[in-house]
Amino acid sequence: MLSLVQKIIGSRNERFIKKVSRIVQKINSLEPEFEKLSDEQLKAKTFEYRERLANGEILDNLLPEAFATVREAGKRTKNMRHYDVQLIGGIVLHQGKVAEMRTGEGKTLVATLPAYLNALTGDGVHVITVNDYLAKRDAELMSDIYEFLGMSVGVIVADLNPQQRKEAYACDITYGTNNEFGFDYLRDNMAYEKEQQVQRSRNYVIIDEVDSILIDEARTPLIISGASDDRSEMYNLFNRLVPYLEKQEKEEVENEQEQRDFYVDEKSKNAYLTEKGYAKIENMLKKEGILEEDDNLYSPHNITKMHYLNACLRAHSLYQLNIDYIVRDQEIVIIDESTGRAMPGRRWSDGLHQAIEAKEGVKINAENQTMASITFQNFFKLYNKIAGMTGTADTEAFELHSIYGLEVIIIPTNKPMIRKDHHDEIYGSVREKFDAIVEDIKERISKGQPVLVGTASIEASEVLSTLLKKKKIRHNVLNAKQHEKEASIIAMAGYPDNVTIATNMAGRGTDIILGGNLEVEIAQLEDPTPEDIAQIKAEWLKRNEAVKKAGGLCIIGSERHDSRRIDNQLRGRAARQGDPGESKFYLSMDDNLLRIFASQRMAERVKKGLKGGESLAFGFMSKVISKAQGKVESYHFDIRKNLLEYDNVVNTQRKVIYEQRQSFLEAEDVSDILADIRIDVAEQLFHDYVPAGSMHELWDLEGLEKALKSDFMIELDLQKLYEEDDSLGEEDLKRLVREAIEIEFVEKTKNLDSGAVRQFEKFSLLQSLDTHWREHLSSIDHLRNSINLRGYAQKDPKNEYKKEAFELFSTMLDNFKYEVISSLAKIRIATEEETQRAQQEWQESMSDIKAEHESVIDNNQRHDEDEQEEAPKVKQVRREGPKVKRNDPCPCGSGKKYKQCHSKVE
């Protein structure tokens, strides 16, 4: 019934395309009129549109004219005319949806339409790409169009200094990577002066390869961190011991003879010790003198040893060189499992990166303490409007809609797609599969057909390369090790009988043109004459026709990826813009996807039925593969959804802290803010010793006096005052405490330089808030890692997490207020000698903070070494008395730690 209705009225997607086609007709009707405009008249349109917006007109009304303007500018500056389907794509993006456009349909050009329209508001447009190369390339390619129309274009890449970043963000349209935009947001919320912040408002963002960024990278939060204590000796110790542990094939074994020391869960990438393994590692640690004879690993004080052990166990059993990471310049570089790209600067958390460094014998860098973090899911939700482009979003439409509220619209191709997709061939072993791939390649290049082979890992690409070399078949390899040659290798991939082996092609961003890339060939000529160019074109046309006759580009997949979307991205490299093309996947029952997620019984039956070199290639196996991929996609979706649910708790807190911090940063004078905080602190302190509504017998006035003296340098004899006038009630005493704190502060600052005091107050607020937020993030991490254990007590871990995270947050805010008022209460007029010493201490403290920020920026390759900041000239202030640390005995004499007594204001 549903299919019948769809045949009559069309699918939702078809109805949408039909609806926006009317807008396209309107844009097309304007084309003759805009063609008659002079360059100056066309350029003046930008000013006209901005005036109309200022007078109350909305962007939707301007769309047909604005798009017609961009199309005409494209024709005049780039000799590129936007197709009708590209106009549809632009409308979809403007409406805050995801446009699924096939490879070769010109997504880069499409983005110019909504980018120009939305930049007319003056609030800026961000265009996100997956790497620096594409950000620079796309900005350079399209800058002629934007600049012709009076729009400024900026690019954010890794090696820019803060001033260059600020200028790029101030442009009408800014290109850059998701990482750069995210890290700049975090760094802006760590700045100590408004001028240090580089970003402005987050208005409208267009995300290229939106599925890769919002889905594949959603599980990896952006983290800015500083180094903690060095524990390299512990990693080296466990790295030496772990290889002695034997792997058990599965979690449950039938008899003791099969039991080994540990087993792995490849789905979750975790490794677990068995009881036998615990006993074995305990004995080894006792021999090493790390554990006492009567000690055991289960003891609470050995939890850190378990941390090192688990990290090293995972490093040895689950993470492989040239598959999950490579070693480059004596550093571990992670490989993106979705794109096959190296990701320098990224590090695994939970000690895993250090464990892999120990395993590979490179320098072990200290574990980091989180200073600021955010997931891409929550970062992009900060924008007023999100839009995205990709070649393969339809399979992830549900997730994009449920998490981001993004609707996926499939854009028709400009020309019919005529790619031939062959059935998968499945072999019994990996070796048989690779042999079959080599034979297929040999046959195809004999007729002049170019071949692109997609592999899931560097290791697979190198194995295949070795086999091709033995057969003397010329080929190029593109993986994380050869990323510098990427553009030139892809430019050659469409040549007749050319063979290219590449790890996952997602995000490569360069079209493979049949016969080779003509523009690249012409660009390589030095001072070419018209005759030279004509000859190159003639040769290219011959090659182009020859490749088409041979069947176009053939895509060979060496295995299925966990996600159908990644397979579709690989397939999508063939048959662009109506060209012919083919695709075929080769699998073996030993491939990770089938080995981990397909049923074991089915795998055994297939292997048993296949003789050496034989393969299966028919319908039911496609269903098996599709079912296995569906399991993986569902599993990963649940992980991402779970991550978001937990991160939303921290995200709410992050918004509160960052908004509060920004108000501190922007305020010229924070004295009113501090006055309000002093009132809160006085009330909190008072009720710590005088419970609200309690009888006099429960009052601890002596303890309150001690706290006032030790934390606020205030001598106030409350007991004497009460004895002299027993009519004093709770409210009267509270008022006395509040007034004493206020008067003491006014008295101590009235003779100080007001500018220096204001500066010191602002810095104290920012530094104290940062310190407490950082400690809070660490506490939240510990809570998150242990909260699932609540399930054993029949409690919902998520609800428990929300409740305890809120309690931690409330306590953190109280502690922040208390500490900042306490520190400001300990300033006094200093002697000249003390002034010089105070200035030196101040500069050292500022240096520590800057070094902390520098270490973070260095970790992410974003530091401008030439930039030097002048230390604030605060000469008249210094702390009186030593600072009480959180774990020191509380000065009030209670016998408790400070953090459990006066640091904690309920």
Curated annotation (Swiss-Prot):
The lineage of its organism: Bacteria, Pseudomonadati, Pseudomonadota, Gammaproteobacteria, Thiotrichales. It is found in: Cell inner membrane; Cytoplasm. Monomer and homodimer. Part of the essential Sec protein translocation apparatus which comprises SecA, SecYEG and auxiliary proteins SecDF-YajC and YidC. Its cofactor is Zn(2+). Residues 852-906 are annotated as: Disordered. Its EC number is 7.4.2.8. Keywords: ATP-binding, Cell inner membrane, Cell membrane, Cytoplasm, Membrane, Metal-binding, Nucleotide-binding, Protein transport, Translocase, Translocation, Transport, Zinc. It is an enzyme of class 7 (translocase). Pfam families: P-loop_SecA, SEC-C, SecA_DEAD, SecA_PP_bind, SecA_SW. GO terms for biological process: intracellular protein transmembrane transport; protein import; protein targeting; protein transport by the Sec complex. GO terms for cellular component: cell envelope Sec protein transport complex; cytosol; plasma membrane. Zn(2+) binds at residues 890, 892, 901-902. This is Protein translocase subunit SecA. Its main location: membrane. ATP binds at residues 86, 104-108, 511. Coiled coil: none annotated. Part of the Sec protein translocase complex. Interacts with the SecYEG preprotein conducting channel. Has a central role in coupling the hydrolysis of ATP to the transfer of proteins into and across the cell membrane, serving both as a receptor for the preprotein-SecB complex and as an ATP-driven molecular motor driving the stepwise translocation of polypeptide chains across the membrane. InterPro entries: Helicase_ATP-bd (IPR014001), Helicase_C-like (IPR001650), P-loop_NTPase (IPR027417), SEC_C_motif (IPR004027), SecA (IPR000185), SecA_CS (IPR020937), SecA_DEAD (IPR011115), SecA_motor_DEAD (IPR014018). May bind 1 zinc ion per subunit. The keyword Protein transport applies. The gene is secA. GO terms for molecular function: ATP binding; metal ion binding; protein-exporting ATPase activity. Belongs to the SecA family. SUPFAM superfamilies: Helical scaffold and wing domains of SecA (SSF81886), P-loop containing nucleoside triphosphate hydrolases (SSF52540), Pre-protein crosslinking domain of SecA (SSF81767).
